Each structure stands twice: as C-alpha cells, then as structure tokens.
A protein has these predicted regions:
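Gram-negative outer-membrane beta-barrel transporters
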Residues: 422, 429, 493, 614-621, ...
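Membrane-embedded beta-barrel scaffold of Gram-negative outer-membrane proteins
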Residues: 368-370, 376-392, 552, 558-564, ...
C-alpha cells in the first residue's frame, strides 16, 4: 500500500508542470494505391503519430518553431517535410505525396529518430521486440564513445549512464563487472545479460554471472533498462543489459575492418571482422585475439574468440538470422592481498599457481515476421554449452602456499531456451499504442564439481580422483516457463499508460554429494573427513505486476514514472558452496521486492542541454548477504567465517542525474567543431531493515557507494576526436555487519577512489589511429574484496595503462 501511495503521489505531481503548445494537422495523400498503415515521427524526439481513418495525421502539443516530420507508409518511400508551429497563426495543413517502393519490415523499424547526444540514445517506445515507454533506459553507441574499447573499459564506455559502479578484475577486459543502484557488480550478476536479446550468462536462474563479454569492437550499441524490465525479461533487480551486435554493411558485398592494438604490460589485441550484403543475405563475423598481463606478477592471460552471423530476408515480411559465438580465455590469478600488504606494496603477488579458464559457446536462431499490417512476431531460440574452471590454492591469503595439490572447481553449463513475442500496434485518436504478449521456455543443467588437482604450477585442469572427488559433485537442473503482457495505451495526446504483468513458473533442483574436511585453523592439518549426499527440489509460481505513466506534451521534454515488482531466484551458490571462507545457511529463500522510478528527460535551452534526471526507490526483501560469524568444528576448534543467509530487508533510495551541455551550440553556433561537457551524478542511500540480528538494522548495504560522480569533456573537429573524463567513487562496505577490518581481508571497507582517463582518435581515409591512457594519475586503489577466486582478499585495480590502436577499414 505504501508503494502504491508513493507512486501515485509522484504521478499526480506531474500536473503542476503541464503546458500546451500549438497544434499541427498534416494531411497525407498517397499517389497510386492507398496505404492502410501511415505513421510519422518528429525530429529530435521519440514521438510518433498514426494516421486516422481519413488518413490525416494530427500532431498535437508541439512547441513553437520549425520541425522536421518524417512520414512512413507501408509500401511507400519515407518522406520528410518542414512544418511550422505558431500560436499566433491558424492551424497549418500540409499535403505530402509518397512514392511507391518495395522495402521490408526491418528497414521501417530502424528509421525512427532517437534522441542522441555523442554516443547516447534512448530506446523507442515501441521496438520490434518490446515496449520501453515509461522506463529508465539508455543506449550506448560504442563507435561514438571516446573510450578504450579494445579492453572493454567499462569506466569509459558507461561514463554517461547514471549510477554505474564498475568492479575491476583483470587488465584485458575479459570479464565485465558492472552494477547499478547499489547492486553487486561482480560479473554483472544483477543484470539480465543478453546478446541480441538472447541469454549469454551461465544460468539465467541459478548462476546469472557473465563470464563472457562481447568485444565492444563488434557491438553496435549497448541497451540498458532499469528494474522495470522485470515484466518483459524476468528475474534480476538490476534490469536488462543487452549487447546488440553489428551487422554487415548494407551497401557493400564485402567490408573488412582490422584493428591492431598494443599497450602497457605486453598487451596485444587483434580484432578483425568481415561483413556485407549479397542479394537477400546479410552476414557479419569477427575473430579476436588478446594477450598480455596486469601490472602485478602472475597475471598473464590469453583470449581467442570468434562470432559468425548470417541473416536472410524471406520476402518482404520475414527474416531469419543465425548466429554462433565462441570465446576462450585462460588467465593466471595473482590472488588477493591483506590490507597491510596492499598498503606496503600493492604490486606483489603471493599466489603463482592459481589459474582461471573459460570456454563459452552460444548459438541462436532469430525469426522476425509481420503477420498482419500491425502485428509482428519475434522469436529467439538459443543453446548455450559452456564451462569455466578455477584452479589453485583456496586457503586464506594469510596462509602461505607451500605447494602440494591444488583445488579445482569445474562448472559446466548446458542450457536451451526460446523467447517469443507478439507486438500488436494500434492507434487511439491518432496516438500510437501497442500491446505485447510474450512467452519464455527455458531449461538449464549445471554441473559443478570440486576436488583436488595436480600440484604443478601450470594450468592443468584435471581432477586427481574424478570418480571420488574430495570436495563435491552436484548437478543443478532448472526449468522456467513464463507468460507476460505489457501495453502502451494512449490516454490522450499527452498521457500514456503502460500496465503489465508476468507469470513465472520456476523449478530449481540440486542433487549430489559433498565432503566436509575439518582442518586445524593454524597448521591446516586435516583432522577428519566425511561425505554426505544432498538434494533439493524447489518449485514456485511468481506473479510480477507493474504500471507506468508517460507525460510528453512538449516535444523536447518528457516525464515518466513506473512501479514494478522484482524477483531474484536463489543462486546455486546459495544452495551449496565448498569454500573454507564461506558457510551457507540452510533454508534460504528467494529475494523479492519492487522498484519505483520517477524522472524527466529531454533537451532544454534550444537543445543546448540534454538531461535525464530521476529519483528511485527499491525495496529488497529477504536480501541474501554475508556476515562474519564464529563456528566450531567437530574437534571443538573455533574459526571466523563469512555466513551467507537471508539477513534482512533493504531499502534503496537515490537520485540520478546525467546532463550534457553542447558548448558549441551554446556559444559558437556557427562553428564546425563540437565541444560538449557532461556530468553524471548518482546519490544512493541503502540501509538494512527488519534484520534478524538487530545490530544490522540501519547498517549500510554492501557495494553501495553513496556518491558516484563522473564528469568529462568531449571534442570533435573533422577527423579528430578526443575525450577526457574524471571519476570519483565514495567508499563502500562489503558485509552486513559493516566491519571495517578483518585479518584475511575478505571483508572490510573499500576506500573512495578517483580516476582520470583520456582517449584521442584521428581518421584519414580508410585509416584510424586511436590512443588511450587509463588511470592517468596512476592512482593506487581497489574495487573488490573477494571471498574466493580471484582472491581471496583485496584485488588491486589497474595502474596507469597506455594503449595505441591502428584501424584499417576496406
């Protein structure tokens, strides 16, 4: 009830800022035959208008001045006209003649104008595969960002996305770790992570960590939708993170792009892609190789990956796309440090036998079709067959690795799924609307094994006793079926309503055995060992509901609000984990809650300022977290461990503001160069409530910087482009007790840090030269305390790194 009351207070507060502008009517007359579907889009906005039964498009509430209106009709070429809105003149009428042509559905979908500002855009209200009105969303256009994309530098790539918290784990960008609104950034686990709309994480329900990140050199854009994405995409409080891959050139039969990068710490990156179109076919593929090391010892890595995609048009209304992704990398893990070791010399490493390997394979088939003039279908069927292996000494960083056998943890993931969506477009009094109906069927099977491996120094990923493991052997089957619907309902020319609901049926199981070993806390001597069989079976139905509103009477500004329920299934690591630093509580429950957004976005001062400002509240119930506790083994010896359980509820409230000033348009409107200045600020307060341990009430939630600030300047002049950005992240805590120090450094404070990055580029004909310097001031800091791999302990971030890239495009 409190959620509903708070939400409607926000909605009705919009009434105080309503205003009306001049209306414009536009008559569209077609030459030859008549078209039954006519739609128009207004420049520099995402507003669209549908013709009524008399084939008249009424554009209402446009601010005064000249605008470009682009008209589309099925079977006809697009036509753009200039229209003039003035409160002092009668409502103007325009006639537009359209010429008949042949084109396909996908061409219509991508033409609509987006609000864009140097690498940033917004999703359209109605996309081919979903509805995004009334949702906080961002599109990052990778080729337009001043960023080091060879190493997937998240700090630069997401510099204009509010509240992104980056966790650094390796120098080559092998894994991406980002979180929003105070959610844990480890391997992007709190996002529903996808590539071209299909799953790429280990297991969407029980193991949502992303061990594979698409190379940003092959990514056209990155789409982010906050918590309200739960209705269309299911579990995860963070929302949707989708990497939209590039496609082959529509103008060439063959286009080749080769990018060669060298950098600090022996970095070598080679990215080579081909793409093009031939008849009804479009294709794209790449091969990428990366190798190098971090600035610490024992951090060597090598990575190889390739991607192949082919699409074919089946007439004018259907397309079929096939894609396959492979990624392999092997990296040495330097291990963690204690607080004292980090202070004395963060360059050291006390682990030289720890390794990590990933072998990722994903295949997908996508079918897009137009069933009727206003009804489209999008269906994706994907298969994932992948593995990851962690090898090394798992003991506390306070213990010396004296050799001997190592621990090997091997995870194997085999998943298959289908997601199908129907989008029905309609118009109500000349205003566009749509209803989406979707389904998802998913089956996953994860096998996780842990045991002893050879005591060599190299990456020998083989168990000594595969039939009788010393640690554990579990299979985790999971099944998921879901139905959802969401609608974009125009209430008037200004107001839009977006109700939705999702019904989930989830089954997660586990079956296997584990071995308990009791060791002396000081000497590590094995005192006793026992094996136990274990199994679980959890079946549940989850109903998620949500509603949103959009108000947009002025074309340059819109106000949005939404409230949606969220859900996060227990991970497999919440069922069982064999790690001497972590104890799992029996009987843990799934996490539930809701998210509320209220914000405004658009352009001000004659489009000099672009902005997106919002406030949010996220209620997290049964939050799973870790606390320090003392346990006693069978021999009566006590030790302190991290205890994982449903520890409390949590309330997150925050403010997010991103603004960018076009200095050139403001001060030098006739200049050919462009200078922009952006600021990105997120303020988040996250506190525990209703905790079983009273001392936790009011404590800060883990991995939540209260202040997350980024600012930067971007400059472009012809072939030259550059960007400089500054990041400042306030301190974070890492457990629910808010402990500031622990001897093995698995919990404690992550101090505030500041980082400066810069990128420049120069293009000449077919060549492009890029240079990046990350962490210009050579700051010493860290973003993670790990309880297991790649630690345990403090994982230092990268020091100053310099990169140079030469690109050839033929």
């Amino acid at each position: 009830m409190r959620m509903i009351a708070f939400f409607f207070v926000l909605i009705f507060s919009v009434q105080f800022i309503q205003a009306q502008d001049a209306g414009v009517d536009i008559k569209v007359r077609l030459e030859g035959s008549s078209a039954s579907s006519i739609e128009a889009f207004l420049d520099n906005t995402d507003r669209s208008f549908v013709a009524n039964t008399n084939r008249v498009i009424e554009v209402r509430n446009v601010h005064e001045g000249q605008h470009t209106l682009t008209v589309f009709a099925e079977g006809y070429a697009p036509q753009s006209i200039m229209v003039n809105a003035s409160a002092e003149l009668p409502v103007p009428n325009y006639n537009v003649g359209l010429m008949e042509v042949t084109y396909d559905l996908t061409e219509v979908e991508v033409v609509e104008a987006n609000r864009s500002s140097l690498g940033m855009k917004q999703l359209k209200y109605i996309e081919v595969d979903g509805l995004y009105a009334a949702k906080k969303n961002d599109i990052v256009v990778t080729d337009e960002m001043a960023a080091n994309i060879s190493t997937n530098n998240s700090r630069q790539v997401f510099s204009k996305v509010a509240g992104i918290n980056v966790q650094e784990t390796d120098a080559g960008g092998l894994q991406m770790g980002i979180g929003v609104r105070g959610l844990d950034p480890k391997r992007t686990t709190n996002f529903n992570t996808r590539q071209d709309g299909y799953d790429i994480s280990a297991d969407a329900l029980g193991y949502p960590e992303s061990y594979y990140t698409p190379p940003l050199e092959a990514v056209e854009q990155i789409e982010l939708v906050r918590g309200a994405a739960s209705l269309q995409y299911g579990t995860q409080f963070g929302g949707l993170l989708n990497f939209k891959m590039k496609r082959g050139s529509e103008e060439k039969a063959l286009e080749v792009v080769s990018r060669q990068t060298v950098g600090s710490c022996n970095y070598l990156g080679s990215f080579n892609s081909i793409g093009g179109s031939a008849g009804e076919w479009n294709y794209y593929g790449y091969f990428q190789h990366k190798q190098g090391s971090g600035w610490r010892p024992n951090t060597n890595y090598i990575s190889n990956g390739f991607y192949a995609q082919a699409g074919r048009k089946l007439g004018n209304k259907w397309t079929v796309d096939l894609a396959f992704t492979h990624n392999y990398y092997n990296s040495q893990q330097a291990g963690g440090l204690t607080d004292r070791q980090f202070e004395v010399n963060p360059n050291v490493s006390f682990r030289d036998r720890n390794w990590f390997r990933v072998n990722w394979n994903v295949a997908n088939v996508t079918v897009n079709g137009q069933l009727t003039k206003n009804l489209t279908i999008n269906s994706k069927t994907f298969v994932l067959s992948s593995s990851r292996a962690a090898l090394g000494y798992l003991g506390s960083i306070t213990r010396t690795d004296t050799g001997g056998t190592r621990d090997l943890i091997l995870g194997e993931f085999n998943n298959i799924g289908n997601a199908t969506r129907l989008v029905q477009r309609f118009n109500r009094n000349g205003n566009p609307g749509a209803i989406i109906l979707g389904s998802r069927i998913y089956q996953g099977n994860t096998r996780n094994r842990q045991g002893k491996a050879e005591g060599f120094d190299g990456p020998d990923y083989a168990f000594l006793n595969p039939e009788n493991l010393e640690g554990s052997d579990f299979t985790f089957p999971s099944r998921n079926a879901a139905l959802f619907t969401e609608a974009l309902i125009p209430l008037s020319a200004c107001w839009y309503l977006t109700p939705g609901a999702r019904l989930e049926h989830i089954i997660t199981q586990s079956e296997g055995y584990y071995t308990e070993q009791n060791r002396h806390p000081i000497t590590g001597e094995l005192l006793s060992q026992n094996s136990f069989d274990a199994s679980t079976n959890r079946e549940r139905n989850i109903l998620l509901m949500g509603i949103g509103f959009v108000w947009r009477c002025r074309t340059s500004v819109e106000v949005y609000a939404n409230a949606s329920q969220n859900y996060r299934a227990m991970n497999f690591s919440d069922i069982y984990v064999n790690n001497p630093n972590i104890i799992i509580a029996p009987g843990m429950q799934d996490e539930k809650g809701f998210t509320i957004d209220f914000g405004a976005k658009g352009k001000l001062l004659k489009e000099v300022v672009s902005f997106d400002a919002s406030v949010f509240m996220m209620q997290y119930r049964n939050r799973i977290g870790e606390t320090l506790t003392t346990i006693e083994n069978q021999e009566g010896i006590s030790r302190i461990v991290n205890y994982r359980d449903n520890i409390a509820d949590a309330l997150f409230v925050g403010v997010e503001l991103v603004e960018e000033v076009d200095v050139t348009k403001w001060l030098f409107p006739n200049a050919e160069w462009q200078l922009t200045w952006f600021n990105n600020l997120a303020l988040v307060d996250a506190r525990y409530q209703n905790a079983e341990v009273n001392a936790f009430n009011g404590n800060r939630v883990e991995n939540v910087p209260v202040v997350n600030y980024k600012s930067g300047v971007n400059f472009r002049n012809g072939r030259f482009a550059s960007g400089v950005q500054f990041s400042w992240i306030s301190d974070q805590i890492t457990d629910a007790s808010n402990a500031e120090f622990f001897p093995d450094a698995t919990v404690g404070v992550i101090p505030s840090y500041q980082v400066l990055d810069a990128t420049v580029s120069y293009s000449w004909k077919r060549l492009k030269l890029e240079g990046s310097v990350n962490n210009i001031a050579d700051q010493i800091y860290f973003t993670r305390r790990a309880a297991g791999y790649p630690g345990p302990g403090i994982i230092p971030a990268q020091r100053r790194m310099v990169f140079m890239t030469l690109q050839v495009k033929i």
